[in-house]
């Protein structure tokens, strides 16, 4: 029986490349000359720290970062940015988390979405991924389109497609 897994992962190497590209652009931009502005990736806890002298510049840095990550194949929805920026001394910063794995509430929404679609497939939650099995490949491709089309707040990848 054909099956596949629904996962939500961020390739840390691609994230590092995107952060490096963003830092390179910030260093060459005229509006950031003479300004303390940094973007750092912390591999251990999978966060990106964006720091600058004003909250407006932090927003600009986040826009640059999102654009560079998108070019590296990482969608902006996989970056969890808090609404409030932290003001410390003369700098503003924000720590954005990279979303890894699918939370249980989102998993339940996906399973409910699949069951409500009346397709002849089964969805099982396995840790931080969802295994979908069905009799026909067409049903599985319909599930892929359904999950991509559903607004669930984070990007999903499909792995281990078996026929």
From Swiss-Prot:
CDD domains per the UniProt record, alphabetical: YajQ_like
Residues that bind 3',3'-c-di-GMP 1: 33
Signal peptide interval: none
Description of activity control: Activity is regulated by cyclic di-GMP, which binds to YajQ and enhances the inhibitory effect of YajQ on flagellar synthesis, allowing Salmonella to survive in the host.
Record's keyword annotation contains Amino-acid biosynthesis: no
Keywords, sorted A to Z: Nucleotide-binding, Virulence
Inactivation phenotype: Deletion of the gene has no effect on the growth properties in LB medium. The expression of about 40 flagellar genes, which belong to class I, class II and class III, is significantly increased in the mutant, resulting in high flagellum expression. The mutant exhibits increased motility and higher pathogenicity.
Positions with a binding annotation for 3',3'-c-di-GMP 2: 135-138, 163
GO terms under cellular component: cytosol
GO molecular function per UniProt: nucleotide binding
InterPro entries xrefs: DUF520, UPF0234-like_C, UPF0234_N, YajQ-like_sf
Xref: Pfam families: DUF520
Keyword Nucleotide-binding: yes
Function: Cyclic di-GMP effector that influences virulence by regulating flagellar synthesis. Binds bis-(3',5')-cyclic diguanylate (cyclic di-GMP or c-di-GMP), an important bacterial second messenger that controls a wide range of cellular processes. YajQ influences Salmonella pathogenicity by inhibiting the flagellar gene transcription, thereby allowing normal expression of the flagellum. Cannot bind GMP.
HAMAP family in the cross-refs: YajQ
Entry's family note: Belongs to the YajQ family.
Domain notes: Composed of two domains with a four-stranded antiparallel beta-sheet flanked on one side by two alpha-helices.
Protein name as catalogued: Cyclic di-GMP-binding protein YajQ
Organism: Salmonella typhimurium (strain LT2 / SGSC1412 / ATCC 700720)
């Amino acid at each position: 029986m054909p099956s596949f897994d629904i996962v939500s992962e961020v390739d840390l190497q691609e994230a590092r490349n995107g952060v490096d590209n963003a830092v390179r652009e910030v260093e060459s931009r005229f509006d950031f000359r003479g300004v303390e502005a940094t973007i750092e990736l912390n591999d251990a806890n999978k966060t990106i720290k964006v720091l600058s002298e004003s909250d407006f510049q932090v927003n600009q840095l986040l826009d640059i970062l999102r654009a560079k990550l998108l070019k590296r194949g990482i969608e902006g929805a996989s970056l969890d940015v808090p609404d409030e920026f932290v003001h410390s001394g003369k700098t503003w910063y924000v720590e954005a988390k990279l979303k890894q794995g699918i939370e249980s509430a989102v998993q339940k929404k996906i399973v409910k979405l699949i069951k409500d679609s009346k397709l002849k497939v089964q969805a099982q939650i396995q840790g931080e991924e969802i295994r979908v099995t069905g009799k026909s490949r067409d049903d599985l491709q319909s599930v892929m389109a359904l999950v991509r089309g559903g607004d669930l707040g984070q990007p999903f990848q499909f792995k281990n497609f078996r026929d």
